[in-house]
Amino acid sequence: MSEFKRIPPEQALALRAQGAVVVDIRDPQAYAAGHIAGARHLDNHSVADFIRNADLDAPTLVVCYHGNSSQSAAAYLVGQGFSDVYSVDGGFELWRSTYPDETAQGTPE
């Protein structure tokens, strides 16, 4: 894949169930208040370590608030060598309203 794909929450849920990596690029306070269960918080400070330790061929889902900022972050990851990147349309807000039981709270790991 030479560029990322935009996908709806339903497809993201299926990919997540198959083991896709989920990264949340919202601010730490928003992440702590609620995020997709199993998502890793990613910001300017943690992205280098994430890239260094990542499987570049693993499906990677990028989530933001509403599905806009995640597109830029997904494009960045593709530029860093990731081959299977998805931006989740509607972001966490749509995910939370669609799958409230698939969310978690707490601070980044």
UniProtKB/Swiss-Prot annotation:
Pfam family, any one: Rhodanese
Catalytic activity line of the entry: thiosulfate + hydrogen cyanide = thiocyanate + sulfite + 2 H(+); thiosulfate + [thioredoxin]-dithiol = [thioredoxin]-disulfide + hydrogen sulfide + sulfite + 2 H(+)
Subcellular compartments: Cytoplasm
Active site positions: 64
Span of domain Rhodanese: 16-104
InterPro entries tied to this protein: GlpE_sulfurtransferase, Rhodanese-like_dom, Rhodanese-like_dom_sf, Thiosulf_sulfurTrfase
Organism this protein belongs to: Pseudomonas putida (strain W619)
Protein name (Swiss-Prot/TrEMBL): Thiosulfate sulfurtransferase GlpE
SUPFAM superfamilies found in the cross-reference section: Rhodanese/Cell cycle control phosphatase
Function: Transferase that catalyzes the transfer of sulfur from thiosulfate to thiophilic acceptors such as cyanide or dithiols. May function in a CysM-independent thiosulfate assimilation pathway by catalyzing the conversion of thiosulfate to sulfite, which can then be used for L-cysteine biosynthesis.
GO annotations of cellular component type: cytoplasm
E.C. designation(s): 2.8.1.1
Keyword Transferase: yes
Protein family membership: Belongs to the GlpE family.
Listed GO biological process terms: glycerol metabolic process
Molecular function via GO: thiosulfate-cyanide sulfurtransferase activity
